[in-house]
Amino acid sequence: MNSIIGGTDPLSMIFKEEEIKKQQILLEKEEKEKQEQQQKKLNKDNIFKLEEEGKKLELSTKVHIQHPNISTTSDNNSLLDPSNLTLNGKKKKWINSFCIINFDLEIGQVLDYSFPQVNFKEEESTNLCFLSFPDSNSHLQGDIIYSFKLKETSSLGNGQCNFQYGYVFFRQEKDSSISRGYLQKSVVLLSDESFVGLFKKVMEIVGPLYFDHGNTLLEVAYQNIMNWPELKLGQTYELPILGYILTFHVPHTRGTPHIIDPVVKQHQLGGGSGGGLSSSPSSSSGGGNIPTSNTTGVSPSIWSEMKLVSNLKSIDIYGCFKSFTTKLWMLWELVLLGHPLLVISPNPPMCSDSVLALVSLISPLHYCGDYRPYFTIHDTDFHKYTSFSHLSGTRPDDSNNNNNQDDSEYNNNNNNNGIPPSILGVTNPFFLKALGNWPNILTIGTTQQRLGGFKKIKSSLPNIMSKDLLTRHVLDNKEKILSEYKPFISPDKSVLKKITESADDDIINEVLRTHFLQLTQKFLIPLERYFSLLLPLAKTISIFQRPPRLKPFIKEECLNKIMETDERFIIDNKSKEIELYKQFLDCVNFKQWLDDKRAQAIKHLNILYRKAILDADIHTLLRGKPISTATDLLKRVEDQLILEENLFQTSKEIKDKFKSHIEIIRQYKNNCDNNNENNNNNILLTSPIKSTSLSSIALPPSSTTVTTKTTTTTK
């Protein structure tokens, strides 16, 4: 009976084993349920993160559509960022000068006048004159506006070059008083800023009025612009110019062309006259032909158009590439990866607009190759580019071939014949011979477009073409993309459907700009995630230490992170997506992106460090700290004050705060020095050992000698 109660009988043992098994099953079930709950929570968190990223993407898209080049990751705490106060801490000019380029029958293009006077070197002056005129023979009359980049002959220390941006109003009309029978003259605005939308609108106003009022008009216009508010990044301004007000938002970043048009209003002065505009035969060349001057006031059609100018009305992607809508994704890749592109067009406006539209395709990324919206055979860099074309070879395949190729065929995507990343816009067919074996050539624009009409022309060319056939092809105004590049990404069917269903070109342009902006942002998501792992934590910022450094960006590690995730960012085929990222990490656009991200992160860390100093309770932080710590801190705060006084336009209030901190630290150091001195004296006076040795040291040497002698004598 006792053994039964004690549970040692076989039945009890079996019962215990069953109980143990039941408990194990329950524990396993609980553990499984716990894991399932954790997985659900993890999935929920991931979905939430994706939704948050989607919201951020949607928000930044809306912001960027209104203002391309706006920093979608910038810190909003501009009060703490001294670099937001001005450009490089000093007042920046909106423009450099106005120039007049005339055609002289004996010497050709010549710089007639400039205000303020420019001091160009001979090469720069030559480039300016040729860039300010169409590089092709044409007897068409009218006005055109386009833009170019003017290279300065002196290079920077880092191997890069300075550029000015030129905005041209060119007029050609019959004039019997001129021996050639035609007036050919250009008004040019030169600026360090690539505000294409703004300055093309300025030239629409200034150009026609110049031909009525002469050089004095340019001086007045220049003074108007010099009276504009100080140029600061990220600000919105109302800018008066010759009776009009241009509402313009300055982008948050510099370097990439800012192609958004400003909103235009007219002053209500003297019955509304102030240099009115009237319409002339328009061209579809991206705003090529423009209104001409008229003293009778503003034509109702033009005025209504001007009032309707919105921030969405920019360089027209659809207008430039209407014949290549299915190839826009391939063009996006070519620009993204920095492949060289030659754009051939019949006129400078379409040429320059097409190049700028290509560069803007990868926004908000900065295109870091050498892009020239308009390039001529007389440019001093012409021989540099022809030197890259000495290699012989067959023409690229027709890009209309089937792109569903095996992955092994993508190894030819980097075959650029040693040509650096560049996009050249040209109008002279001679470039087809000079740069005949550039790997990617885009011929755009037809005679119908040049005359105002637009007709889509399809061509059936052989896959491999000779240079002569290619030249005839361009001279016949056939539009084509000639490239052997095999794209990774396929056209978006939903976007193509919207294009076919819409009859409004402005809506189509907005759809395309939004799509490619989001495409670039989605492409950057894994790179942004990896870069965030390189950043130090904000809690590591301490006023007693310099801001922490960033970890190095390791390409292989980044690619492994992308491989490990199951997400597809822009391509369904994972191997193709990895290959696209691999090629991007080796191109110049990535290098600039990484440099910009590092600079932005370091800047942010410095802002946090600056904020930590400003917000610090120095009395509390120094309590109990050794004098060496106070000395180091004093040096750091003094260095920061030097930066505030010399590089930044810091307010007096903030500078006084730094000075107050410096005074507190100095007082603390003085107190430490005094305390140490007092402590040393107290130690010397109170310690018996030290007192004895002190008294022994104080005794005269003779007294010691005498005592010794006396002792000896006594003995």
From Swiss-Prot:
Disruption phenotype: No visible phenotype. One of its GO terms (molecular function) is guanyl-nucleotide exchange factor activity. Residues 478-600 form the dDENN domain. Residues 13-58 form a coiled coil. Residues 299-476 form the cDENN domain. It comes from the Eukaryota. Residues 96-273 form the uDENN domain. Residues 399-416 have a biased composition (Low complexity). Keywords: Coiled coil. One of its GO terms (cellular component) is recycling endosome. Residues 269-296, 392-416 are annotated as: Disordered. PANTHER family: LD41638P. Belongs to the DENND6 family. This is Protein DENND6 homolog.
